[in-house]
């Protein structure tokens, strides 16, 4: 078996571009802002792409403290957390329990909304793709706390590094409100560095203008 290479932001950006996960252009977001790029982690839908993403999460988690359980919010976070658990085991020789939540509670079988590793009394890291408004993360944090977990932190694939409704970004708001660290595999700055290195002047200028208007 070939040992996976360590995660590198540029390699991930190139893979994201090749899969259509990341696009540069003009995109209207739900917020109404016209963004010069769009990121859709749902298109990381093959083994190579998912493996590279999971390697990034796993590498980052080995630098974090208090990793008792890793948790993927339904639905998109479920394959991410499962693949990350595999990467932690195969690459870092760390067997970390993992779990996820259902959108709707079951009243038979396992029951409830939580599936997988027990979280009561555990320090839990949440793994997701992005934090846009922070609503979904807050909901998951509430579910986990109600189950007796301590939230150790959140890992996301992309930090857009842009303000929400106020002066803080959605990630900064979550960090301040919930008093937990939030780490990202790549940031808007990484995207801009990539464009600069590739000589993509028009796309870079659009990113710079957007960051001046909405950046943190």
Curated annotation (Swiss-Prot):
Pathway: Pyrimidine metabolism; UMP biosynthesis via de novo pathway; UMP from orotate: step 1/2
GO biological process, one term: 'de novo' UMP biosynthetic process
Named cofactor requirement(s): Mg(2+)
Binding annotation for 5-phospho-alpha-D-ribose 1-diphosphate: 30, 75-76, 102-103, 106, 108, 128-136
Keyword set, alphabetical order: Glycosyltransferase, Magnesium, Pyrimidine biosynthesis, Transferase
Keyword Glycosyltransferase appears in the UniProt entry: yes
GO cellular component: cytoplasm
Record bears the keyword Glycosyltransferase: yes
InterPro entries tied to this protein: OPRT, Or_phspho_trans_dom, PRibTrfase_dom, PRTase-like
Annotated SUPFAM superfamilies: PRTase-like
GO MF assignments: magnesium ion binding; orotate phosphoribosyltransferase activity
Pfam families, alphabetized: Pribosyltran
Sites where the protein binds orotate: 38-39, 132, 160
Alphabetical list of NCBIfam families matching this protein: pyrE
Family: Belongs to the purine/pyrimidine phosphoribosyltransferase family. PyrE subfamily.
Assembly with partners or alone: Homodimer.
Role played: Catalyzes the transfer of a ribosyl phosphate group from 5-phosphoribose 1-diphosphate to orotate, leading to the formation of orotidine monophosphate (OMP).
Protein name in the entry: Orotate phosphoribosyltransferase
Organism encoding this protein: Acinetobacter baumannii (strain ATCC 17978 / DSM 105126 / CIP 53.77 / LMG 1025 / NCDC KC755 / 5377)
Gene: pyrE
């Amino acid at each position: 078996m070939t040992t996976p290479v360590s995660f590198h932001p540029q390699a991930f950006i190139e893979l994201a571009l090749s899969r259509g996960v990341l696009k540069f252009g003009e995109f209207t977001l739900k917020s109404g802002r016209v963004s010069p790029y769009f990121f859709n982690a749902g298109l990381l839908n093959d083994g190579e792409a998912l493996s590279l993403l999971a390697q990034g999460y796993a590498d980052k988690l080995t630098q974090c403290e208090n990793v008792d359980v890793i948790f993927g919010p339904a639905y998109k976070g479920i394959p991410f957390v499962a693949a990350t658990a595999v990467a932690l085991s195969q690459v870092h020789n760390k067997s970390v329990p993992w779990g996820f939540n259902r959108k709707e509670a079951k009243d038979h079988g396992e029951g409830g909304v939580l599936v997988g590793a027990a979280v009561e009394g555990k320090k839990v890291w949440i793994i997701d793709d992005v934090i846009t408004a922070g609503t979904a993360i807050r909901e998951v944090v509430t579910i986990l706390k109600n189950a007796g977990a301590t939230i150790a932190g959140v890992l996301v694939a992309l930090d857009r590094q842009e303000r929400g409704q106020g002066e803080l970004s959605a990630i900064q708001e979550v960090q301040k409100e919930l008093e937990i660290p939030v780490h990202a595999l790549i940031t808007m700055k990484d995207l801009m560095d990539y464009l600069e290195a590739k000589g993509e002047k028009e796309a870079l200028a659009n990113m710079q203008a957007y960051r001046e208007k909405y950046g943190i």
